[in-house]
């Protein structure tokens, strides 16, 4: 694909055909194509780049899969620190990537001026070209960065560098309609004589791309207005063919200024001498010759500029002399257009014009007169037919391509004619004649201006006549049977020599007509052959263009089909993934509801345990009171210590229960917050289809964490169930102790009744001792239960921490995903 090319339509800049070369960032970066040092260069992490170079010094000029170095990527991203680090490490500054672009070209392309300045200071070559033939200056022209262009030129950039289309930066700025860059390059003395492959000058390109501002700038630089391209067309012809009236007026005004300057150089004496001499020569001719001369002069003036001469030779082409202005009067009646004409192009134009006027005049009389004139012309000019055929054909093609500017050509013709006559005939006339003929010259100039305007209209009429001439080709085919019949008649006339004189005259007339018709048929056949060849060439060109267009259309259709298939596949895949995510979300919501219900059950169980503990404490306090009344001081102290420990244990259990309830409320709040975040993430998942894979990984991680949390929760439930069983056992033992206490109270009553029985008292004391031991055992069991409660608390704390860590990990994953997308 070409970088620079002219648009297919008039006035269209080259930007439409450039595509991705000048739009967006310089590179399409994919993470899979990069190494560590390249990733660090893209991010602008100079420290990481330095670490990579410290590990492996060979990574300094390492290339990725697209043949890009770290310097290319840093220049494209505009990371000045990385560029300075790599340049100071003496990397290859002029290394090229896959498109043969240097880091300097890439920096200018991405408009990273700081990076470009660093590279230029360290000796980067600004004249290297990429695969499209463009230098860094071409890219600076496209981006219209005068500061970058100035720095490139100050460091030795070639201002006349050519791309593949032979466009200099000035021509490329004109094609892209960059008026500021055109002014800048002209100030830097860019050449206005540069041409492209079709030999089109800067002015022609400015006209072709409809840039009147650039045209005015170039005209101020005194650019060559008469320069021609390969087809012989100048800037004014471009303006006429594209109907650009404003630009045409600008060029005409500039030409008139040039002509005025040339006229001012010629003296007034020379002008008067020329006018007098011209008038005397006209008066000296006979009347019939005078008429023919006026026709010839009117015909010669406009044909002079119909084909402007290329390059610096346009001044010679403007020196047109009147057909009979310098020749003697005797040569005029023959109306040979070759007399007095120096330029071969002008000679052909005059000859063509005279032949056309003769044909136009001969078309008026009757058919018999036409036959006579054809007969005379065939007798006089048969040897000249073969020579004039090729010139007439080329002249017809040239006249169909170009329309002359009659006003400027007439003025230039008059001026050159006056110069020639003024030099050959210096002041040889008296003063009276000068005054008389000055008036005549003014009248003649006015008449010539009107004639020039009429000639422009006549040229159009001539083109219409040529269309009629091409129609005569069909008539030529129709004349072939008549020619054959005439030949048969001539043969019969030859075979019958004994006929009378009238038949002999008829045969002579038929022979003459036959010769004339043969000559006309030969001319028409040659014209038909040329037309056929031209048509065949055009058809071949059109067929090639059609094949190319068909191939491009087929390739585009295939590409579009592939894109559609890829889009449908990706859409179907994304829909499946979204459906899977929805199912997972519903499943997670159900699991969360189950967890809520289980938490509510746990809270109810904890409340029931608290009520049971309160009842047990009350019963235990009653038993202690009874024991206080029974026991002595020593026994009372033991009972007090036991009650204190039990009360402290119970208070601890209450505190733990309250703490657990608070934790459950906090977990509910966190769960609700997580639920809201989950909803937000679900909404963001719909918007961000590209992050679905990473979200799936996160969801899988969360599922694993939830499963682990479920297992932890089930373990906690089992432990709670064990603790409840143990509490039930404790309650049963307390009831048993209460019963034993009641039995002991009864025995004490009996003892009080029976004070004499000391053995019973000792047994009771033993019973109290055993009950004290049992109380110690119960205290140990209660301590174990407290330890288990502490362990449960620790497991709950770990559960909450793991939840928090899971949320943090999800946030970190999202942060890394967003950072990757930004990169």
Curated annotation (Swiss-Prot):
UniProt biased composition (Basic and acidic residues)? 372-382
Q: Cite the InterPro entries for this sequence.
A: Ankyrin_repeat_domain, Ankyrin_rpt, Ankyrin_rpt-contain_sf, CC144C-like_CC_dom
Q: Where are the transmembrane segments?
A: none
Chain segments carrying region Disordered: 302-343, 355-401
Is this entry keyworded Mitochondrion? no
Coiled-coil intervals: 431-480, 565-724, 776-805
Q: Where are the ANK repeats?
A: 32-65, 66-95, 99-128, 132-161, 165-194, 198-227
Pfam families attached here? Ank, Ank_2, CCDC144C
Domain of life of the native organism: Eukaryota
Sorted alphabetically, the keyword list is: ANK repeat, Coiled coil, Repeat
What this protein is called in its record is Ankyrin repeat domain-containing protein 20B
Gene source species: Homo sapiens (Human)
Q: Which taxonomic lineage is given here? A: Eukaryota, Metazoa, Chordata, Craniata, Vertebrata
Q: Which gene name belongs to this protein? A: ANKRD20A8P
